[in-house]
């Protein structure tokens, strides 16, 4: 990004809103047939200098997801259960979440993480 807030031609990185600093997303202006970058948080948008869009999809396995967030068992926003005790240490409480996997076979699978401080065992049922 240049000091004046513009991007060099052909820039393919992430763009940010000049109003609220959120990420800008590609958006088509169908009436004028141009590509825009628009903020999903406010009304800011800017015309793209290049009509090329690159998509980089990254998928993660549940083990990767729970290791990325080392303190997932301490997350107060995750639901907890005592109906699925840890098979490794016997602790009764676990947090659980549904993976955002795109694979159809994982669509409704729940993943559990033991909340015992010394354990952190991860499993699915």
From Swiss-Prot:
GO molecular function, one term: nucleic acid binding
Function: DNA-dependent RNA polymerase catalyzes the transcription of DNA into RNA using the four ribonucleoside triphosphates as substrates. Component of RNA polymerase II which synthesizes mRNA precursors and many functional non-coding RNAs. Pol II is the central component of the basal RNA polymerase II transcription machinery. It is composed of mobile elements that move relative to each other. RPB9 is part of the upper jaw surrounding the central large cleft and thought to grab the incoming DNA template.
InterPro entries (UniProt xref): DNA-dir_RNA_pol-M_15_CS, Rpa12/Rpb9/Rpc10/TFS, Zn_ribbon_RPB9, Zn_ribbon_RPB9_C, Znf_TFIIS
Gene3D superfamilies: 2.20.25.10
Binding-site residues for Zn(2+) 1, renumbered to this chain: 17, 20, 39, 42
Keyword Metal-binding: yes
Positions where N-acetylmethionine occurs in the chain: 1
Record's keyword annotation contains Nucleus: yes
Organism: Sus scrofa (Pig)
Primary location group: nucleus
SUPFAM superfamilies named in the record: Zinc beta-ribbon
UniProt superkingdom: Eukaryota
Biological process terms in GO annotation: maintenance of transcriptional fidelity during transcription elongation by RNA polymerase II; transcription by RNA polymerase II; transcription initiation at RNA polymerase II promoter; transcription-coupled nucleotide-excision repair
Subunit (UniProt): Component of the RNA polymerase II (Pol II) complex consisting of 12 subunits.
Localization annotation: Nucleus, Nucleolus
GO cellular component: nucleolus; nucleus; RNA polymerase II, core complex
Binding positions for Zn(2+) 2 per the UniProt entry: 86, 89, 114, 119
Protein name per the record: DNA-directed RNA polymerase II subunit RPB9
Similarity-based family: Belongs to the archaeal RpoM/eukaryotic RPA12/RPB9/RPC11 RNA polymerase family.
Zinc finger (TFIIS-type): 82-124
